[in-house]
From Swiss-Prot:
The gene is ywhL. This is Uncharacterized protein YwhL. InterPro entries: Host-pathogen_enzymatic-act, N2O_reductase_N, WD40/YVTN_repeat-like_dom_sf. It comes from Bacillus subtilis (strain 168).
Length: 458
């Protein structure tokens, strides 16, 4: 944002988005009983119904810092819910002084609401009030003259759009940075006792699995609460993770094997030996694992249900070291070459066979990333000045042709938005993530993260 634009916003009383988000509103409702009637709190239960007729939503523009420079300012909207919620609180059973009867006492209570429930990129993104819930309902017995009280928490609805996060594994300070993809700012930093070296997000965006390559551990982050909820033991040096399209299983490459994790129980249920493999990829249907075998110079195909090697491409590759499959399609890209430069070959997954080679040779590739619709692939070479400046190659997968070659300085890993409009590039030497617009591959914002981000996922 230009300085004069920023000044105009500040003159219009635009403040920074610093009000804390809260979707919870606790309440306490005292209950008075008619003379001669009582309730036994040991057996009593409470019920609550509510009306949101007097509740409203407003969008308040505010400012966020989008980059390291003072003029790197953007506008977001604080979504504020305000007004009143009318509660009908009931307690039962209510009995007379002789212990007879099975009635109930109800009280109408009005709860004031005035709080920011989330920040949005656009105005008018109000929540659905029908999704309001009540949690932690509790009956508090009378105490020193105070009446019986029903306490609980109103939980206000989340954003109508699913929250989208970008995660970076920061090897320099053993943290994971969580970036709000709407705000393009870090909203949480999660510390670990072991170094995070790679990570992956389930397709339903519910969980992030963090690999600790210096140990034999995989940590699980709940993406709703952004907290670590479990640690799973696998083989030593876990280096890559992929998920089947149903999110039923996660596959972790470690110690010369694939460790199959049941995501419901978050436990290892099978181990598939993959001797000689330097890399692996799961087919789009989640039925087969394909490995780049640096020992036998082959691409091997394993059935994930039986763990058996079922097919191989042999005697056609020279030291295959990287393999990547798209989200949809019957092909994969294989980086191969014992020395430098190296080539990329397209293979057919079924039947397993070698296809054509890309005409361009590469120093090496750090990663190959596909767009969600699988129409684009992004080949990332190491960045080196002044010899290797244009280090990103954009591929039209239908034509197997490079359609762009641009510069992403210092990029070590990539994540592509589902609509293909932006690329998030992890830059470990700068402790930052740069967001590039794919229409012209210009940087639109720089996001400071933890030290040494070496892997990124969204």
């Amino acid at each position: 944002m230009k300085k004069n634009d920023l000044s105009a916003l500040q003159e219009n009383c635009f403040c920074f988005c610093d009000e804390e988000i809260s979707r919870e509103a606790p309440f306490q409702v005292p209950i008075d009983f008619p003379e001669g009637f009582k309730v036994d709190t040991a057996e009593a239960s409470a019920a609550v119904t509510w009306s949101t007729d007097n509740l409203s939503c407003i969008s308040e523009p505010c400012l966020i810092q989008t980059g390291p420079e003072p003029e790197d300012i953007g506008v977001r909207y604080a979504v504020r819910v305000q007004g009143t919620i009318t509660l009908l609180v009931s307690v039962s059973p209510v009995r007379n002084q002789y212990g007879q009867g099975d009635g109930a006492v109800s009280v109408i209570h009005t709860e004031e609401i005035d709080q920011v429930v989330y920040y949005a990129a656009q105005s008018g993104r109000c929540p659905d009030f029908s999704q309001i819930t009540v949690e932690d309902l509790l009956i508090v017995p009378p105490f020193y003259g105070s009446p019986l009280t029903v306490a609980g928490t109103l939980v206000l609805p989340p954003s109508p759009d699913p929250q989208s996060y970008v995660f970076t594994a920061n090897t320099g300070d053993s943290t994971v940075s969580v970036i709000d993809a709407d705000l393009n700012t870090v909203v949480k930093t999660i510390p670990f006792s072991d170094v995070p070296t790679n990570l992956g997000v389930t397709f339903d965006k519910a969980f992030t699995y963090v690999l600790h390559g210096n140990t034999n551990l995989v940590s699980v982050i709940d993406n709703k609460t952004l907290t670590i909820i479990n640690t799973i033991t696998v083989g030593g040096g876990p280096r890559k993770i992929e998920f089947d399209p149903t999110d039923e299983f996660a596959y972790v490459m470690a110690a010369g094997s694939i460790y199959v994790i049941n995501t419901a129980s978050q436990s290892v249920i099978d181990v598939i030996p993959i001797p000689g493999a330097l890399d692996f990829a799961l087919d789009p249907n989640g039925q087969y694992v394909y490995t780049a075998n640096g020992s036998s110079w082959s691409v091997d195909k394993y059935d994930v249900n039986t763990g058996q090697l079922v097919e191989s491409i042999i005697d056609t590759f020279e030291f295959p070291s990287l393999i990547t499959t798209p989200y949809a399609g019957n092909f994969a890209y294989v980086l191969n070459g014992e020395l430098w430069p190296k080539g990329v070959t397209e293979i057919s997954l079924s039947p397993l066979s070698r296809g054509g080679d890309f005409s361009r040779l590469f120093e090496t590739l750090r990663t190959i990333v596909f767009s969600l619709d699988s129409t684009r692939a992004y080949f990332l070479e190491p960045y080196s000045e002044p010899f290797l400046i244009n280090n990103l190659y954009v591929v039209n997968t239908a034509r197997q042709r490079i359609i762009a070659n641009v510069s992403l300085p210092g990029a070590f890993d990539l994540a592509v938005t589902p609509d293909k409009q932006y690329i998030y590039a992890a830059q470990p030497n700068d402790n930052a993530v740069t967001v590039y617009r794919t229409s012209d591959y210009t940087a639109v914002t720089v996001i400071p993260v933890g030290a040494g981000p070496s892997a990124i996922a969204m």
